[in-house]
Structures are given as structure tokens and as C-alpha cells.
């Protein structure tokens, strides 16, 4: 859809540190949870998430920043190297603390977050500006990702913006704080409604107030375009009048990092020569992709194209997960209630659809465990399944109320339930009075009535009877 253009990201690089564990008791020393650590993961945060989004879109990315001479700074450089992003424009400031946010995660919940960072202005302003200016002509767009940690001071912002204006390079900014004067003359900013309200001292409660605020930002800061992201409503643009581009999200699971995705996509599209309205439309689609995922996600152009071309807006193949992938995804679910059910779903019929729709109503995410072909044969006989596990998974993924499909090979889903630990376990009403596998692991078991006269066995019998009638 677009070319591999060179884009520069300047801003506050951070390290997101996740400590994954389980909590099974309260400490005898104080009324706090005891977390047993299982593993730890690191990922790029702050401006690093903008870098990740640009790479996902296909850009050739460089990053300029200032880090401390500490372990977190070294780890950030390691994570950039893993992504093949060079650190030649990153300076090291002695005595400065690199930003690291450590989150302790237990039983799918964030227990606590611990921040270690410097938020004072960097001492290497002149050196950073010089580095950027020396390389600026190589880039088709510059993105300033401001998280208020001291890298993007007024001097740094204005020197970079003014040089970009001279070279006619678009400079896009995700702003921070209430004083936007340091962003004057930029191509555009991407504040959300709350941030724009604080920057303009205007309460944005309706369309008229939105237009007043967005116009004020454009005029006071001499922006080429004025943009305000308005969450589930989409993106507002002011050129000579107000335009609102409706959001494309069908389902919203997590808005974490959506602002970074919008900034990255707008920058990428403008760098490729798109006009601002086309860029916003694609940014809306990219945001729809990431909010349908959990955690700080990214959107690729293949995902955007699938969403653009699909009348359902569904990305079927991305619903099918391995047990390991699903375990990691659900560990970041936050307060969302996960519902689980399982079955063969060999020939999907109206009874299945109504059953699954009712199951989804019991929570926020519906995970369907699907018996593998080998598992179905053991349970139903050599003549089954009629449809392969891949075909059955594809059909289930096409249902809007099914969030994830996971194939398991055992006769029962006990191992799967043990690993993903859903909140609600759903079975058919025929399990009344029987032991439900996994009931001791979940918080709640719900039984749902089947639709009378609807069954896979019945459908197969009718097909066979019809064939026999044809032979007579």
C-alpha cells in the first residue's frame, strides 16, 4: 500500500518491564499479596512504542533520544537492536536515570506498577539538536513523541521544528502537558479531547466547543493541520472547517497505545505523500486494529487492508491462537471477564450460534476451545469430523461474538483451562448434575440450554437419509 520511507522518531524512550507471576496467598507480614514470579519480559515503551508501530507499517525507522548510563538504558538499546533500529542518534547522559516502568502481573491482573526515571530536562540539548540536524535531510517525516520525561524541551522542539519547516519535512507531535507553545509551527499535533481541553482551557462537551478548541490550537500554534482524537467517535480535523472522521473499531478491548498508533500512521502516510484526509482514514483503521487487541499492540498494513476490505471488519485468522499465545494475551486482560466453552463444532448450526452468543453475554471475551481432528475421532468415531479442524476454526472465527479460538488435542480441555484460567466456564444444560471438567479452576460455571431439535448428529442423519432416498 505504501513505500519503505525513512522516518525519524525523537522523544522519551522507555522500557516496559513485566514481571509475570501467580498469587496464591496473603503475606503474614502485611495485608498484601505474595506473588511467585514465573518469568519476566521487556518491551519498548514511550517513543519506543511509536518506533514499533512504524516498523509494523513497514517504515525504515531511526530514533533520537537521551538515555542514562544505566542498565535500563542498555536494555533499551538491546531491544532496539533486536528490531534492527540503530542507536547512532541516541546520546548517553552520565548520572541520568533511564525510564523504566515495572509492572507486577498476577492472575491476569496488574498488582502494582513501579516507576524509576528522570523527569528533569536533559543536559545534552545542544548535542541532541546537532545530531538531529546533521541527519534531518535523510528523512521524509519526523515524529516527536513527548512523554514529559525531559528529552523534548522547548529548545529541542523549536530547533527541530524550525529546521523541518526549512526543509519542508512534515513534523508531527504527540504532545504532553498544558503548555503547547513549544510545538509552534509544527505540521500537526495529536492531542486527545482531555489534553486539548487542558491546553485551550475550554471544556469540550459538544461539537461547537470541539470546533472552538481545535480552531484555537491551529491559530495560536500556527499548525498546518489541527487534529484532536475523540476516542470512540474517531478523529477531528480542522483545516478551514471542522471535519469528523468516524472511528472504525467494531470492538474495543484495550486502548493502550492507540495514540502512538495514530501518530505513527499519520506520519507514515504523510511521508508517503498522502493528503491529510486519506492519512486520517488510514489512521482510524489502524487504531481500530490495535484497540481490538490487548496491551500496547501495533497494526500492520495487511491487517489494515483486511479491515478495509472486509464487510464485517473481522480479521479471522488473528482469532486463532496457540495455547501459549492465548495464555500471554489473557495475562494482560485487566478487569475483563473471560468466558470459556469448548466443543467439536463439526457442522456449525443455529443451535451452536445461539449457544455461543449467549455465552458471550456472560463476560467481555469469549474463548472457544476446539477439539482437534484426532480428539474428535477418539470421541465421535473414525467417520468424524466431517470438517477439518482448520475449517471448523475458520467458521467459528467468523462469528463476531467469538474473540479467540484455540485448538486442543486432549479428550478434555482441562490442561487448556488450567493454563488460561477463565473466569466463567460454560457448558450445555445436559451437564446438569454431572461433573464439569475444570469447574474447580474457574470462579463460575454456567449451563446454557440447547436449541431443541438442533444437533450435528441430526444434520448428518438427515443428509444420509436424503442420499438414501435419492438412490431409491
UniProtKB/Swiss-Prot annotation:
Catalytic activity: D-glycero-beta-D-manno-heptose 7-phosphate + ATP = D-glycero-beta-D-manno-heptose 1,7-bisphosphate + ADP + H(+); D-glycero-beta-D-manno-heptose 1-phosphate + ATP + H(+) = ADP-D-glycero-beta-D-manno-heptose + diphosphate
Keyword Chloroplast annotated: no
Keywords from the UniProt entry: ATP-binding, Carbohydrate metabolism, Kinase, Multifunctional enzyme, Nucleotide-binding, Nucleotidyltransferase, Transferase
Active site: 260
Catalytic activity, EC: 2.7.1.167, 2.7.7.70
Alphabetized SUPFAM superfamilies for the sequence: Nucleotidylyl transferase, Ribokinase-like
GO molecular function: ATP binding; heptose 7-phosphate kinase activity; heptose-1-phosphate adenylyltransferase activity; phosphotransferase activity, alcohol group as acceptor
Cited InterPro entries: Bifunc_HldE, Cyt_trans-like, PfkB_dom, RfaE_dom_I, RfaE_dom_II, Ribokinase-like, Rossmann-like_a/b/a_fold
One CC-aspect GO term: cytosol
Function as written in the Swiss-Prot or TrEMBL entry: Catalyzes the ADP transfer from ATP to D-glycero-beta-D-manno-heptose 1-phosphate, yielding ADP-D-glycero-beta-D-manno-heptose.
NCBIfam families, alphabetized: cyt_tran_rel, rfaE_dom_I, rfaE_dom_II
Family to which the UniProt record says this protein belongs: In the N-terminal section; belongs to the carbohydrate kinase PfkB family. In the C-terminal section; belongs to the cytidylyltransferase family.
Name the UniProt record assigns to this protein: Bifunctional protein HldE
